[in-house]
Amino acid sequence: MKRAEMANKLIPLHLRKGRILDIGCGAYPFFLFNTSFSEKYGLDKAVQKGDFNASQKDRIHLKRYDIEQEDILPFDNGYFDVMTMLAVFEHIEPKRVVSLLKEIQRVLKPDGMFIMTTPASWTDTLLKFMAKLRLVSPVEIEEHKGTYTAQKIASMLKAGGFPKELIRYGYFECFMNIWVVARTSRQ
């Protein structure tokens, strides 16, 4: 899972003493199992039960939650140090993205970090072709509702309340995927 590795590399050590929320973590929260944080939380419509307890130290708090149906994230203001959305952005109806980003901004602590990954827009045709050959999941590709460039994501993050100067991005896997980091203001 290259996106989980990329997200892990982008998280500074000092933030790992706090809380992380992975939006769209899946029924099996792979990224949360493979990252080190004091408290780990995951949201996904596929979640079946409340917590994973590999050990008390690695406990992951999971909540069934559909970001396509809900408008408010079920957490208090400034609750998380880091929030992630790994290969989820493209599955959200584009008209809902900015309001979701405003919610992410609300739930992040001052100087908090939002990390996301998404396929680069130019890969859409390639991914559809690969899905026809069953090299990638056809169901997953059919569920894509939008394609994005890094610049478009940065613009949406700014509309969602993230300061332009605290947004950075790059590419991985031969420029096929985009990573984006947005910080909240220190206040």
Predicted regions and their residues:
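Active-site loop signature of alpha/beta-hydrolase-fold enzymes
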Residues: 48, 70, 91, 121-124
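Alpha-helical hinge/cap motifs
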Residues: 77, 91-93
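S-adenosyl-L-methionine-dependent methyltransferase catalytic module, highlighting the catalytic core
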Residues: 82-84, 93-109, 113-186
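Hydrophobic adenine-recognition pocket in adenosine-nucleotide-binding enzymes
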Residues: 88
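Conserved N-terminal segment of class I S-adenosyl-L-methionine
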Residues: 1-76, 82-84, 98-101, 141, ...
